[in-house]
Amino acid sequence: MPISSALAERIATSPKAELHIHIEGSLEPELMFALAERNGVKLPYASVEEVRAAYAFDDLQSFLDLYYAGASVLLTEQDFYDMTAAYVARALADNVHHAEIFFDPQTHTARNVPMHVVIHGIVRALDDAEREHGFSSALILCFLRHLSEEDAFDTLEAALPYIQDPANRIIGVGLDSSERGNPPEKFARVFARCKELGLRLVAHAGEEGPAQYVIDALDILKVERIDHGVRAIDDAALVKRLAAERIALTVCPLSNEKLKVYPDLRDHSLKQLLDAGCAVTLHSDDPAYFGGYMNTNWLATFNALDLSAADAHALARNSFEASFLPEQDKALWLAKVDDHWKAAH
């Protein structure tokens, strides 16, 4: 049953933090085409409509193939700036006030785009967003799990000068790309090194991979937050642990539906995980490819799972609690979230 228009409006206007957003996954077809033209890159599509048609993929690998083709248009600092500024505009429209944004340097350095071009373009847009709109943000450098751990170490080494300068906003590392056949332990040493460096640790686990990958990400990689994690529902002991330790799951329902993790949103495990006391949060993942930014994800999920105002309040609170914001900033946002929701349930 669709939720009430009053609840839909309160969800849309609620303060939120976005903790699972790949900046390259926010590249809309129109901007992809504009950048291809600007840079003289030939795309395998004749029109924006053809790109949209290619978005009819139904598994992670087909999506990744398209994602990497799209990234080929990103060549200059201005390209990364434009892509990031476009994401921020959409986030602000959805009342996202803080974002912890993934970026994939290996996708770009493999194409001979220098690390500084990627980082400076993204950071310049985030600096402008903070100055002009008060938009708070941080960056999480992701290693591509289909590549080797040695490649991840090389990437970390190349990124270190940027990581060590707080102006670049890089607070942590993550692990993304093809989960099947690339278990967390493949990256145990590089994550141990990142922990030594004082970086925050997160990893994609339990999306297409099994619940065991969530356990391994926690126990081998020592991550603080699990990206996706929806397959945890298959292991009752793990669900209890996630709830007891308040380990956040950054869940992306439209992504899960599009990639057939859950072919029908009505079957999604989000509500079960939330009811079990897990620190579930709700995000957009790769919104240009999966059909929606934050509010679209929230509203689709609430309609499919018949969630309540109390659920919305919990999800909004969880998004700030699970963030890597300083405690005093978290407290300010949690008070704003509580004010927003106190009259609704």
UniProtKB/Swiss-Prot annotation:
It holds the Pfam family A_deaminase. GO terms for biological process: adenine catabolic process; hypoxanthine salvage; nucleotide metabolic process. Its cofactor is Zn(2+). The active site is at residue 207. It comes from the Bacteria. Keywords: Hydrolase, Metal-binding, Nucleotide metabolism, Zinc. The record marks 228 as: Important for catalytic activity. Transmembrane segments: none annotated. It catalyses: adenine + H2O + H(+) = hypoxanthine + NH4(+). Binds 1 zinc ion per subunit. One of its GO terms (molecular function) is adenine deaminase activity. Zn(2+) binds at residues 20, 22, 204, 285. Its EC number is 3.5.4.2. GO terms for cellular component: cytosol. Substrate binds at residue 286. Belongs to the metallo-dependent hydrolases superfamily. Adenosine and AMP deaminases family. Adenine deaminase type 2 subfamily. Catalyzes the hydrolytic deamination of adenine to hypoxanthine. Plays an important role in the purine salvage pathway and in nitrogen catabolism. HAMAP family: Adenine_deaminase. This is Adenine deaminase.
